[in-house]
Amino acid sequence: MSISIEQAIIHEISQDSQGQMRCRLRPQPLLNTHAVETMLEELHQTYSGKAGKGFGFFGTHGDDGEANSEFSDALTGYRKGDLGFVEFSGQASQLLQQELAKYDFSQGGFLLMSCYTSMTSDYLFVALLSAKSSMTVLDDMELSQNNHLDLNNIQLAARIDLTEWQADKSSRKYISFIRGRAGRKVADFFLDFMGCVEGVNTKAQNKTLIHAVEDFVAGSELTKDERQDCRNKVFEYCSERADAGEVIEVKDLADELADSGMDSFYDFACGGSYELDEEFPADKASLRSLKKFSGTGGGVTLSFDGGHLGERVIYDPISDTILIKGVPANLKDQLDRRLKGE
């Protein structure tokens, strides 16, 4: 296993017959059975591989509408040993119940909380899981309907890097969370119950890095191939960091480029007007523009490797046209068939 489980528990939050949200609390942690270990390992892998996560931190409580600190206070109590895990998770469930009660659309679910270690960091994983209906075939070949936890479609989940939180209280990225298909608004109530405030605009930082890289190669004496090699090295470094669950460190990236003969990127990126943080999470979707050009509009979708620009793909901004040399075989076949009237 890639994780070492310390504690895990599940509580249920659901609507009663009067439509009120109620908690059904489990009185003891889950046993570390094979089923529990398999579930948490799967969730860890699924969550770590989710693209486009947001990052934040615990806000402060105040009279001006700032974040509620009850969750972080309870977590602090647990980490100090003042609260047991069951008591802490029960308080968290009550907080989530109170938050869900504010919304008409709330259906509740199963609140899973787990403390575990991965690599050198301790984490608290928090997810609101839903049950999904499925069919199974019994021994007598009759069909039976049952419910199971939908682990492949988690939309309301967050992970707190406890190690970073305790080591650097000024950090603004020790909480990661899934934004959901419709953006952050879907997860507002889930973040609010934890008192989480978004701290790092991951997409903006990644796009700023790309902007800095493009300006850097444009102002250099590198050849066309060397410029693309620089972009590829940046993409590879950032992708490796994303896959490992690590942040992009601009100084570390600059050292990687310097090893390939591309010096001074750190001074260029951090000494200019880019407002680039020293470190920030990677967003692979944004970084793909270092290797590919792509766009969609007016019924046309086009995508090609950046190295083809100026060779197989010629762009003329004056006439607003793109010339493609060497049409892909499968596309050429479709076009030829259409021209022949087939």
Swiss-Prot record:
Its main location: cytoplasm. It is found in: Cytoplasm, Nucleoid. InterPro entries: Nucleoid_associated_NdpA. GO terms for molecular function: double-stranded DNA binding; single-stranded RNA binding. Keywords: Cytoplasm. Pfam families: NA37. GO terms for cellular component: bacterial nucleoid; cytoplasm. Belongs to the YejK family. This is Nucleoid-associated protein Sfri_2491.
